Regions:
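Hydrophobic/anchoring residues in structured secondary elements
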Residues: 18, 66-67
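Residue-level recognition of the N-termini of beta-strands and the immediately preceding loop/turn
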Residues: 62-64
């Protein structure tokens, strides 16, 4: 949630969930699943990392980025982390 809060502060991010994706070297790679404010010009991974660098420790910075049309949430607004993890894993495999 800390990483999500920082990434929400980027002007190009409308909504975001952050999940761990299995990675050979790191065990798990922090991956941001982002719905951009402007789908025609989504933020890049480098932009998000630069934005978050002042507020987060290096190991918390996203190592992956998946752009989606909409971040899936329940009718009550709860994050669907299973969907986000599946989406991120499918995009990085």
């Amino acid at each position: 949630e800390e990483v999500e809060g920082v990434l929400h502060g980027h002007p190009g991010v409308a909504d975001v969930l952050v999940v761990g994706v299995p990675h050979e070297r790191w065990g798990s790679a922090v991956t941001a699943v982002v719905a951009p404010t402007d789908p025609a010009a989504p933020p890049t991974l480098d932009e998000l990392r630069a934005h978050a660098r002042a507020d987060l420790a290096g190991y918390k910075l996203p190592k992956g980025l998946v752009i989606v049309d909409e971040v899936r949430r329940s009718p009550a607004g709860k994050a669907d982390y299973r969907w986000a993890a599946d989406t991120a894993a499918a995009a990085t495999s």
